[in-house]
Amino acid sequence: MSLPKTLAEDVARNLVMVARLIDEDPEQAYAYSRIALRLASRVAAVREAAGFAAYATQKYAEALAEFRASRRMTGSVELWPVMADCERGLGRPERAMAMAGEPEVQKLDKAGQVEMRLVAAGARRDMGQIDAAIVTLQSPELASNAVHSWTPRLRYAYADALLEAGREDEAREWFGKALEADKDGATDASDRLAQLDGVEFVDALGEDDEPAGAPAEVGEQDDADDTDAEHLDEDDDEDDEDDDEGDEDDDARGDDVDGSTKA
């Protein structure tokens, strides 16, 4: 569907903002996606972007509806894995498993099939079938030494499933393999390895510590103000005493003057 030039430019600007913000500020990305959706709801790319923005903010029912709309418009199966993952998000892992067995999966490219395998394994874990999840992830793609964009996540998911099954030594090995493939920091495999080795992560700043120059708590500030006020009162009292002593000296001098006059 083609749009008038001005409208197309407005839609494009909003879609650019969705792509730019979806990782760092999903809620803001979602807001931009809603604007694009109001402007051009019959454009497949807009429905897809709205779906991913809703997915990023865990609005799974809304995301699923948008992905379905985009698929109806394009006929593409590309969104099939993320649609299945939305079913998981909605607490329906059995539907995700059913989707993993549909003919659409065979039409996916290699990356899409790996994504579907990850979703299916996640659904197995949702249903408490950890051993089945491990078997689901075992594949030629997992065994391959070649590194692709999906390799770190596949190895990480396998390591995580092994750890849940109590197979710690194997889990450590696969977290290590995930880390080797993860050049972009897509996973926290290094942290998981450290945890398995007994490393504890603590905040550099303790709960009772305050950074230098930190403002005092309200109660502490009030106490400081009260102390300052007491000092001021004491100073005032001392000034009053000095004034009284001064008055007495003046009176004494006055008496001396009066006495000399009388004399």
Residue ranges and their predicted role:
Residues T6-N14, A29, A40-R47, T74-V82, ...:
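Generic helix N-cap/helix-start motif at coil->alpha-helix transitions
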Residues Q221-G254:
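Long, acidic low-complexity intrinsically disordered regions
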